[in-house]
């Protein structure tokens, strides 16, 4: 039970409790937990004010996931989920981290704390600094902090500076931030999308001409078939469950594909409906395929084989011939590649039976409007890009683009991670984008590609980064190969963290380090000559809308993110720089005016975003059934079969979230749906696998990963028998990120292979 004062004790891993997994998500318990966390963190009045404004048209966008709100119908009074409420509680908390906290806790002590303990201390109230040789952070004025940043940036060269971005950064901040980095002379703009959905962009851009999804929320409601693959919506996007249930009520079918039988894939107890309060909830998945980790490519190739075999037997029954002939290229090669299939190998790769795959293929044949949704279970494998291209193949075969209820749906994890990329947070900017920036601001910008996240890790470790700036986020805990990343960050001359709460990146600091406290989504932003400001967000379905904080900040010393970026830029580039940084920081309309002239789709930005529901960005595949690829058509592709085969004595491990966390932010210690509580250093593995390997349930082990002859070790994890797919295991991140070698990445996208670890266990002595 939380109290209004944070618990002084850290996690006791020996207190682990294990209960039977749940078979339904949400319900009354979710409401109770949401209210409990909010009131304990922020008090009754502040919690109620916040919850009434979450995801409402006159409120603020939830800082959690990127799931959209309806733009066609009435919104529910509670337009948020349990984990959204936890995110708001974390941000609107009245707990504070004051100078007294930093004075009482040396950095060496904080380095040994967990993310849960650090985050639960509260909101940082004023800027702090640690200088070479010092053991504690101590207060610094804003003016001195910006002067220090300017000195370090001017003392080095642009290619030795890195500007990292978290996915919850709003559009206005993101645009200003990339403009700052490029004005300085670098495209070193890694962001969290490099570590999650980068594979989606690398698969979608060359095949359909856009790196985003092609469906709306209403499309899911009216789809005839939705495949939910490599995704746990009950924890990561709980409001998606309402959409899936609505789809089924309208006659659609849902297929879930996942290595773990997650509660949210089975049933949903809608707490705003009578059935969710008194009954067993609504069924979510009509079919559940418990696939092996990494077996999805084999599954989609098998489905392609089955669809084309049906078309060959019954011409016209499957393939949208007019669409394929007029709007695509490469179909003949794809058809030939899928003509033959080794069923024994396919069953071995997937862990599924042929009959299961044939059932799903029949559902696809019967559907005239199919959507495939996916998340990180598909994007963080060595062969992720090929897997996602195979999904595109399946959608193209039946013409499932540009029609109601059909399309591709990569479900983004973090609110505005998609918007950040749209705003130019990308290490590989297009010539068109750079040319538009130059035309707008009248100064030259660099063309040479910069570092993405994994390349940043390599540069840090090589001592090639002098200044590392983090706009939100927690790079140390989000990145792979934790110990190597920690060592790399400590080699920098200056680390700068724009943050709301303490995290472990703050204590893996450069020789000099600054923590700059900022306003959050919930906070009123009104310290401007131009009056109260709002920001804008792009959700997972390309809807751009406004977000305006409504709660009083916990400290008068906090600055808004655009103000922080502008003042860093002035300190580094001088007040006589051609870009009027200060004016944009005072009036965000000016930032949006620049965006409107630089980025296609944002014309008349300030007017359109002030309308009732904002506006939807253009998507040629969705809007006009056209594809802006280099050949002007959608592209079928052919990929070889690939899957994960662990050596004897090993399992394939994936990292995942608990139900009580969001990315690297740990809300609590209750993974309620999986029945794991009070501890986090656990490995979930099939009981039959544990027995075959000679281990017992609850045994304490070290976990060793193997990649290219290198080993990584995670110490003192508890084995828990769990109904995972055979040959597979799972552990929470960030604790398990230490096992992910930085060179274990997806081909093309360079996304870390968090879902592709070959591991073995060693008993603790």
Residues covered by each model-derived region:
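Intrinsically disordered, low-structural-confidence terminal and linker regions
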Residues: 1-65
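Glycine-rich loop/turn
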Residues: 113, 117-131, 654-682
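Long, low-complexity segments enriched in small/aliphatic residues
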Residues: 583-672
């Amino acid at each position: 039970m939380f109290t209004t004062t944070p618990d002084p004790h850290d996690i006791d891993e020996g207190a682990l409790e294990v209960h039977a997994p749940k078979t339904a998500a949400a319900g009354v318990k979710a409401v109770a937990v949401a209210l409990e966390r909010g009131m304990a963190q922020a008090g009754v009045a502040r919690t109620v004010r916040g919850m009434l404004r979450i995801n409402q048209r006159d409120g603020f966008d939830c800082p959690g996931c990127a799931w959209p709100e309806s733009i066609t119908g009435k919104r529910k009074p509670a337009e948020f989920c349990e984990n959204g409420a936890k995110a708001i509680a974390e941000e609107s908390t009245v707990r504070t981290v004051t100078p007294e906290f930093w004075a009482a806790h040396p950095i060496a002590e904080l380095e040994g704390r967990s993310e849960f303990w650090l985050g639960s201390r509260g909101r940082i109230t004023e800027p702090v600094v640690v200088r070479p040789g010092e053991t504690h952070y101590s207060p610094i004025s804003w003016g001195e902090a910006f002067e220090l940043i300017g000195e370090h940036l001017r003392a080095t060269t642009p290619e030795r500076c890195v500007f990292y971005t978290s996915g919850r950064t709003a559009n206005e901040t993101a645009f200003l931030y990339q403009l700052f980095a490029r004005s300085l002379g670098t495209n070193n703009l890694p962001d969290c999308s490099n570590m999650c959905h980068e594979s989606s962009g690398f698969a979608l851009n060359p095949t359909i001409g856009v790196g985003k999804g092609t469906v709306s929320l209403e499309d899911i409601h009216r789809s005839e078939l939705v495949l939910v693959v490599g995704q746990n919506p009950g924890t990561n996007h709980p409001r998606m469950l309402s959409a899936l249930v609505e789809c089924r009520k309208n006659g659609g079918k849902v297929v879930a594909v996942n290595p773990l039988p997650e509660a949210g894939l089975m049933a949903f107890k809608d707490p705003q409906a009578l059935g969710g309060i008194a009954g067993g909830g609504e069924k979510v998945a009509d079919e559940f395929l418990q696939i092996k980790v990494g077996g999805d490519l084999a599954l989609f190739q098998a489905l392609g084989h089955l669809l084309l075999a049906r078309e060959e037997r019954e011409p016209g029954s499957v393939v949208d011939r007019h669409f394929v002939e007029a709007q695509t290229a490469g179909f003949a090669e794809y058809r030939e590649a899928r003509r033959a299939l080794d069923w024994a190998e396919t069953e071995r790769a997937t862990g599924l039976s042929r009959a299961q795959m044939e059932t799903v293929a029949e559902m696809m044949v019967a559907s005239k409007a199919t959507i495939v949704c996916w998340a990180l279970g598909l994007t963080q494998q060595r062969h992720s890009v090929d897997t996602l291209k195979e999904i595109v193949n399946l959608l193209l075969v039946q013409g499932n683009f540009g029609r109601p209820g059909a399309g591709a749906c990569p479900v983004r994890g973090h609110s505005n991670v998609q918007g950040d990329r749209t705003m130019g947070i990308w290490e590989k900017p297009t010539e068109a984008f750079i040319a538009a920036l130059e035309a707008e601001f009248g100064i030259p910008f660099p063309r040479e590609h910069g570092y993405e996240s994994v390349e940043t890790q390599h540069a840090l470790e090589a001592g090639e980064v002098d200044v590392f700036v983090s706009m939100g986020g927690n790079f140390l805990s989000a990145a792979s190969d934790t110990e190597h990343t920690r060592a790399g960050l400590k080699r920098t001359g200056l680390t700068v963290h724009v943050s709301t709460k303490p995290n472990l990146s703050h204590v893996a600091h450069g020789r000099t380090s600054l923590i700059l406290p900022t306003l959050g989504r919930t906070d009123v932003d009104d310290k401007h000559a131009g009056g109260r400001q709002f920001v804008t967000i792009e959700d997972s379905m390309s809807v751009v809308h406004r977000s305006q904080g409504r709660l009083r900040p916990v400290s008068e010393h906090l600055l808004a993110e655009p103000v922080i970026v502008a003042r860093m830029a002035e300190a580094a580039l001088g007040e006589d720089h051609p870009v009027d940084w200060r004016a944009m920081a005072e009036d965000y309309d000016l930032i949006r005016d620049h965006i409107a002239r630089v980025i296609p789709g944002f014309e008349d930005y300030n007017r359109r975003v002030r309308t009732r529901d904002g506006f939807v960005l253009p998507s040629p595949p969705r809007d006009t059934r056209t594809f802006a690829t280099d050949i002007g058509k959608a592209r079928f592709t052919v990929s070889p079969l690939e899957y994960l085969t662990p050596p004897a004595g090993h399992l394939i491990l994936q990292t995942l979230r608990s139900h009580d966390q969001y990315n690297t932010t740990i809300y609590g210690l209750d993974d309620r749906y999986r029945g794991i509580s009070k501890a986090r250093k656990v490995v979930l593995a099939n009981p039959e696998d544990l027995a075959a390997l000679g281990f017992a349930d609850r045994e304490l082990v070290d976990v060793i990963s193997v990649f290219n002859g290198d080993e990584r070790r995670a110490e003192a994890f508890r084995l828990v028998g769990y109904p995972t797919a055979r040959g597979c295991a799972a552990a929470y991140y960030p604790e398990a990120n230490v096992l992910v070698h930085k060179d274990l990445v997806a081909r093309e996208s360079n996304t870390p292979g968090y879902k592709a670890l070959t591991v073995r266990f060693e008993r603790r002595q």
